[in-house]
């Protein structure tokens, strides 16, 4: 499991923590998705919207569960994409309530980063609460030739900053956050592999 400190001015700064202020936030990237499995940067977008995870992804999530079970996690925040919901269910089952939070969604770069509206998510996951989500909870802006609204890096970084402020303000701890590669990169400077777990200090 990777461990990271806060990134300031391009430097990675590690902190000593007392037992009270000990880092207890874990960032988990989703398992391999159907989009991940076929994506090639030199080829056209395969146009797989809100991609589910693959059989390999299911295996990755079950393996991650063995690691995560050893951690002190009492809260769970999950991105509303299908791949993160599936990953979280395989890792955590019904052990913890899901807090669905669109702030931890992926940067919209490709078709897989266009989500499903709340009524569709509620149909597929009737035991979870999506009522607080906007109909279009992913980035919405000027569309490119694919009909996709790419989220600028500046907006991604601002969203990551807002989320860090939320973690600090609410004194979030003992928490796993099932999210995405670019969002985790915006928080930490590290783009994790599928189902990699990163210990995160928001301070």
Question: What is the meaning of each model-derived region?
Answer:
Residues 5-8, 17-21, 71-103, 122-138, ...:
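Conserved histidine-centered catalytic loops in small-molecule metabolism enzymes
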Residues 32, 82, 104-105, 182-184:
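Catalytic metal-binding/acid-base residues of hydrolase active sites
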Residues 161-203:
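Active-site-adjacent alpha-helix immediately C-terminal to a catalytic or transition-state-stabilizing loop
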């Amino acid at each position: 499991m990777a461990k990271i400190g806060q990134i300031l001015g391009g430097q990675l700064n590690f902190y000593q923590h007392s037992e009270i202020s000990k880092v207890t936030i874990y960032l988990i990237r989703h398992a391999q998705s159907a989009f991940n499995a076929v994506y090639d940067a030199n080829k056209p977008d395969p146009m797989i919207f809100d991609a589910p995870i693959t059989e390999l992804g299911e295996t990755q999530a079950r393996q991650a569960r063995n690691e995560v079970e050893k951690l002190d996690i009492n809260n769970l925040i999950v991105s509303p994409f299908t791949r993160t919901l599936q990953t979280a269910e395989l890792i955590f089952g019904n052990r913890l309530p899901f807090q669905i939070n669109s702030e931890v969604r992926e940067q919209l770069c490709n078709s897989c980063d266009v989500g499903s509206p709340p009524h569709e998510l509620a149909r597929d996951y009737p035991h979870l609460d999506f009522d607080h989500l906007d109909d279009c909870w992913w980035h919405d802006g000027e569309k490119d030739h694919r009909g996709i609204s790419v989220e600028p890096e500046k907006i991604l970084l601002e969203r990551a900053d807002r989320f860090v402020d939320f973690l600090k303000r609410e004194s979030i701890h003992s928490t796993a956050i099932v999210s995405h590669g670019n969002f985790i990169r915006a928080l930490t400077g590290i783009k994790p592999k599928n189902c990699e777990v990163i210990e995160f200090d928001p301070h």
